[in-house]
C-alpha cells in the first residue's frame, strides 16, 4: 500500500517532562518518529513541554512548540497550524490522554484533524478497563476475575466476593499511578480512594491477585493490511505483582517451552488484531508455572518503555516503523534499516541474552518505602547483552552505579542469615543481592523459590555464579578458571577479590595472556542476513566482529541510567557532541548502557558499544579501537568519575585536562585559584571527622551547609543549624564518600544565579545568565530558573560576566563549564563550579539558538570560538522570558519528604516561554502539573522564622479573592495585619487540617519546615497528604510568591476605596 497523499501536515504530541513511569524512552520514540515522517515527505509539527530532549530540537521537526501539554494549549496550536492529522501514540500516556481529550471536546472534529495510527475506539478499548474486559470475554481470552469500581463502597462489595489479595489498577494512568496490592481493609480503602483520584475517568479495575504467575510480555507490530509480527518477547524474573518497569527483565524469555511460547504468541496477535492496532503495541500476560493456564493482564496500544527496550534488544526500530505504518505503509514494503536487505515483516531473532535492571532512586531517598508492587518506582534502567544469562546479568548489575559490582552487597558478610531471609521474603529493589548472599550461606534454592516464586531456572543461574566464586577462591591465579569466570561475565574487580589480588594485577594478567573480549554485532537476524549495523556488545569468545577502521576516532562516554540528578539533559549533550565529532571528520564512538535514550540508537554514532560504564569495560574498548582520546564532559558525573581511572592507563582525556577537572573539585586547590583571580566564595573549611567539623562550624558560625566533595545532584547535602544536627550529619554522611572529606561552608542567603559558559582556552562565551526564583539553599535542579534575569542590576550582571570569564580561564576550561553564584547583601560569591556539561545546557541551547554542546565539542577538537563567529562575554539576549520549572514524582514514592533543600529531588523539567515573566511562569507551572486557579482556598502553616514574610503573600491572595485557612500560629500573625483566616486544627485535633486537605477543601498548601521531632513529623504528614491528594504543596516561600504573582496577573484585585 502506498503512503497516504491526502495529508500533508502531521502534529506529533510528545510525552512532556520525565517522571517515574515516563522517562527518556519517549524522547527516543518521538525523535525517531518525527524523522521517519519527514523522510516520507510530511511536514511535522511537534509539541512537547520538555526542553531537555533531542526531539524538541529545530532539526527534528519542521516546527517545534515547547508549550504545556494541556488541552487548552494544544487546541491553540491546532487552530493556529491547522494540521491535517495528529499522531498520538508516541507521547506515552500523556500523548494518548491528550488525544482522547481533544477528540471528546470536539477540537479535532472542528478543525478537521484526523487521528493517525491506531483508531481512537481501539485506544479506548485497550485503556478503558470495562471495555477491555468485555472484548476479552468476546474473544474467549481469559482475564483475572475482576470488577470495575467508581467508588470505595463498590470496592468493598467486590472484596466480599473474592477476598484478598486484590490488585487495584486505575484507568488511563501510566506507571501504575495510584495503584497497588491490598491485603486488608485499610489498604483497600487507601489505595482505591487514591486510585480514583489519579484516574482521569475516576475508574479503577479491581482484580483477584494472580501474584506468583510468570509475567511475560510480547512486543508486537501490526499494519493496516493485518500483517502482524512479534518483535521480541520478554520474561520478568519477578513474578506477577511487581510493575514491569520495576522488574528485572530478560529477553528472549528463558523458561517457556515451545508450546507455551507459541500459545502466548498466538494470543498476543489475536488480541492486537481484534483491537485493530496499527503500529507498535505491548501485551502483558500472566502464565501459571504449573499448567497451561494464562491470563491477559493488559495491552498498551502505544509505544512504551518496553518497546524502547525491545528496539535496543533486537535492533528493530519500532517507533520509526510505527510512524510509517500510521501513514499507510505496510511491514512487507518497508526495509529493516538494520540489515538494509530484509523486510520489516521478518521477525527478529536473537543469538544473545539481554538483561534489563531498573535503576531506583533510593540512594537519594533513603527513607523512601522500598517495597515494590504495581506502582512503578524506578527512574530509569540499564540493559546489558551477553552470550549467557549470567554474563548479561552481571554486566547489567555493574552498569547500575550503586557501588555494587556483583551478585551481592558490599557489606554482605555483616548481615545475619535471618535478616537476609527476612529481606528476601519482601519484594524490594535489593532482593536480587540478598538472594546471592543467601546462596553463599548455603540456603537451598527450594527455600528461596518458596519465598520469592522466582523460577528455578534463574535460581540455578544465580547458584552457578556463586559456584564460580568458590572455584576462583580454590584456584587462585589459575588462568583456566580466570577465563571460565570471564565467560560468565565476572568483572576483574570480583575476580581480584577471590584471587586475593588487586584489580590492576588481574587486568595485567589478562593482558599478558591475551584474555580479552571480542565484540559481536547486534543485527536482528542472528547473522542470517548480511548486516552492517555498527552496534556491538563485548563477550569472551573467539571471533571479533567489530572491524577497526583507520580513521581517527573520538570516544564519547554516555551518562548511564536516568536517575535523580542525572537526567536526559546529559544524553542530549552526548548526542550533540557526537554530531559535532562527525561533522569535523572523525569517527564517533559512543559507550553507554541505557536502553531508553537517543544516544543508544545505532543510527546516531559511527559505532555504538552497549557496555557498562566501568573502568574495565571502557578500557577493553579503548584497547581495541585506540581512539585519539576520550570525551568525559558530556556524560554527567558517571563519565567525569572515570576520567582519573582511564588517565592512569595512559588514555588521553580530551577537553579540560584531568588536572583542571580535579582543581575544580579539590577544595584547597580551588581556594588557591579563587584567591589568585580574586573571586570571593562563602567562608568554608574541610573536615574529615565529627570533631573537626564542630570546630569549623564554631569558627564560621551557624547556619552552615555541609556536603561531601565529588557528588552530583546535591547528594547527602544539608543545611544545619546547631552542633547536634552537625554531629548527626557527620556520623551519617561521611558514609556518602569515605575517600573524600566533608565541606563545611557558611550558608549565605540571597539570590542564586546559574551561568553556563563555553571556553576554547582563549575566548569565553556566555550564552545566558539564569536567575533562580528560590533563594540559595534549594538545589539548582529543583529551582525555577528564569532567563533573562529579572531583578539584577547592571553592576551585578557585569560582575557575574567578569567572574565567569576569570573562572573559565583560570581553570583552563576547554569545553563547557557551569557555575552557581549567590548574590548576598554584600556582593557576588561563587558557590560551585562544575567543569562539564550541565542540566541547563539543553534549555539555554533552545532559547538562544547557540548549539552549546556542539560548540564545546568543536572547541575540544581545537577550533576557535572567534572563527565560529562568537565574541567574548554574554551573548545577545533572546526575546521574551523563559522559565525552567522542575517536575517531581512524589506521588509515586511513599515516605519521601517533599521539602525543597540542597539535595535534588526532581525527576524532570518543563519550559515556559512568553512575553512576560508572569505568563512564562503560568506556562511553566501549568506544564509541571500545578493547576493555577484564579480563586480557591489556600492553607498556610509556616515556621516561626517565615511568619513575617508570609504576611505579604497572604495579603495578595486575600485581595484576589482566595480564602485562607491557617494553623493557629500563622493565623494569629495574619490577624495582626487584619488579614482574615479561618483557623484549622493541628493534626488529630478538631477540624483537623489533614481532613480538610483530604476532603478537597484546599487548592494550594504553603508549608515551610520547622525543625524538631514532633513538628517535623507533623509537617511531613501534611506534605505527604497534600501530594497524595494531588494538591500543589509549596515548601519555599519564593515559589509561593511566584505563584501568587501569576494568580494576581490573571485576575483583578478588589480593594475598597
UniProtKB/Swiss-Prot annotation:
Positions with a binding annotation for ATP 2: 707, 746, 748, 752, 777-780, 820, 832
Pathway(s) per entry: Amino-acid biosynthesis; L-arginine biosynthesis; carbamoyl phosphate from bicarbonate: step 1/1; Pyrimidine metabolism; UMP biosynthesis via de novo pathway; (S)-dihydroorotate from bicarbonate: step 1/3
Residues reported to bind Mn(2+) 2: 298, 300
UniProt cross-references to CDD domains, sorted A to Z: MGS_CPS_II
Chain spans, region Carboxyphosphate synthetic domain: 1-401
Binding-site positions, Mg(2+) 4: 832, 834
Biological process according to GO: 'de novo' UMP biosynthetic process; glutamine metabolic process; L-arginine biosynthetic process
Keyword Manganese assigned: yes
ATP-grasp domain boundaries: 133-327, 671-861
Cofactor: record remark: Binds 4 Mg(2+) or Mn(2+) ions per subunit.
Residues engaged in binding Mn(2+) 1: 284, 298
Annotated Mg(2+) 3 binding sites: 820, 832
Binding site for Mn(2+) 3: 820, 832
Binding site for Mg(2+) 2: 298, 300
Transmembrane segments: none
One Gene Ontology cellular component: cytoplasm
Keyword list, A-Z: Amino-acid biosynthesis, Arginine biosynthesis, ATP-binding, Ligase, Magnesium, Manganese, Metal-binding, Nucleotide-binding, Pyrimidine biosynthesis, Repeat
Residue ranges, annotated region (Oligomerization domain): 402-546
HAMAP family: CPSase_L_chain_A, CPSase_L_chain_B
Xref: NCBIfam families: CPSaseII_lrg, PRK05294.1, PRK12815.1
Family of this protein: Belongs to the CarB family.
UniProt protein name: Carbamoyl phosphate synthase large chain
